[in-house]
């Protein structure tokens, strides 16, 4: 019972922290992404291929937090569902957009499988919604036994993203 209670308390602490991590305000988006990757790797020893360019976020908080949430949900899906041993996370910022590539070598899935579980598993729907809120594009490819790749492009023109969603 005590161990179960400890796990619940730890889950609550992690949830509260992840609502708006201190690293986000203090150190920025790059450090927040690095912290998410550390969290992903805490329980398992993934082989990690990580490249994060200077991804400072000078736009408003809404944009940055939504982008953070999208990445967070992608990484949580890997941790919860993929059974992967390797994870690739590349994030760069060009003059026009953020480019994020997240890939694993896990068990993969089919879109039919996701649609069948739509009422109980909505991680991918949350990811798509976040990308849409930022006027971005997302491409998800997955196959049973071949892992999953998520390719996200988010334009830096915040005005068009906010205008689209007003």
Question: What do the PLM-derived regions correspond to, one by one?
Answer:
Residues 1-19, 27:
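Conserved DHp (HisKA) dimerization/phosphotransfer helix of two-component histidine kinases, i.e.
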Residues 6, 23-44:
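Short beta-to-alpha transition helix within the HATPase_c
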Residues 49-72:
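Conserved short strand/loop->alpha-helix "switch" segment adjacent to the catalytic nucleotide/phosphoryl-transfer site
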Residues 64-86:
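Conserved ATP-binding N-box helix of the HATPase_c
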Residues 86-96, 103:
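Short beta-strand/loop element within the Bergerat-fold HATPase_c
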Residues 105-107, 122:
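Conserved post-beta-strand hinge residue in the HATPase_c
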Residues 114-144:
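ATP phosphate-binding glycine-rich loop and adjacent ATP-lid/helix-beta elements
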Residues 146-148:
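Glycine-rich GHKL/ HATPase_c ATP-binding element in histidine kinases
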